[in-house]
Amino acid sequence: MSHPEPEVRLAGVFLSVYSTSVTRTISGSILQALKRNLSHLHTDTDANFRREIHGYTQKLFDRLRASTATLAKSKSKSSASERARLAFPKPTPGLESSLSKRSPRDSLLESLSFVFWYIRFLEWELRPTASYQSRITALRCLIIVLRSGVDPGVPFASLSKSAQGQLNWAHGLQIGSIKLIRSLLDLILDPYDDVRDAAVSVLQLCLVALPQPDRKRVMSTFPHFIARAEAAMLRTGRADQADGVARAYGMLFTLASHGPEEPTDSQFASKLSLFEHLQTQLKDTLQVTHNDLSRAVDGQPVHGTFAALRYVVDQSDFYALIAGAPQEMFTRWKQLHGDIVTSIESLWSCVYHVLCADAPEGHVPDELEDEISLDTKEILSYSWRGLKEARYATLNFCRT
């Protein structure tokens, strides 16, 4: 696995994780070899190489799930029908060295200790100073680990096909932690699109798997995160940060409750209140655009809000949710939906005189010519970004 040739490294990983019998125990020496080599395997610059590593990680956890379940069943005297998960052994200083000195080796404890180590290793790979390859590989491997079923809180429908079979984990480990969730929130604003997408997927699985009290506690921190992310988006106007904020809103909409919000709840407590918040934000931003285009270009980008609405409306159950709502809520949904369609027309009325001028570089209105901080490129960028996201939102509205 440390050979200079990538084909040999991949062959080494394959031979380490593959077996004709999925319940066959992985030896402690192989697990130690994986620990020594996973760091450089995850950071390979070849995307195809990393894709192969993802496939082998899937095979590794399929085998760990089956082998540990078989070992636990042989050690346990409880009935086979008992479904309560056993706790993972808590790591202690010197555990690894003590395992290597035991005779005979405790294969179950070695395998469970490796799973615990691997999750902590993936968390470390998400650090801000890590390379792009480390971050994206760790995120995709975390998805594999979560979908393997080792966290008992992950819904059955979200598990991989192999994890939905007969051989289930005998032990359970809660993967979502404050440290991991904080790292994932930071990665939602990552410059790379695939990192942002994977971070949202991992975070959503982690939040769904958390016990209800823990989930509520974590969700209570989201308004502060959204406010911080929106402030950065407004300050820079960068498309990647706007997309990160939009993805965060889409995830919050998925996790929000279906019912009407209580007076004490935040604006993100229910799907309707969150959608209403986005519509109000869009309306206020467009009002600024109507009144002072230079101010809007300089610090009130509209494309982030349209992108957030696109991620919300693009969810498969969005219109089914509206159709099944009580009459009073249905009326509010319908009104908000119509207001957003009107806002798309409003954006066009604000920028068409810039984009439709008979000039290749666009037309700068007279009132903006004296703005030293603005040029034609910035005005065109503001206009086209907003219209691009508004177009995607319109396509989602019309498609359904």
Which sequence ranges carry the predicted segments?
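Alpha-solenoid helical repeat scaffolds
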Residues: M1-A33, N37-T285, A308, S316, ...
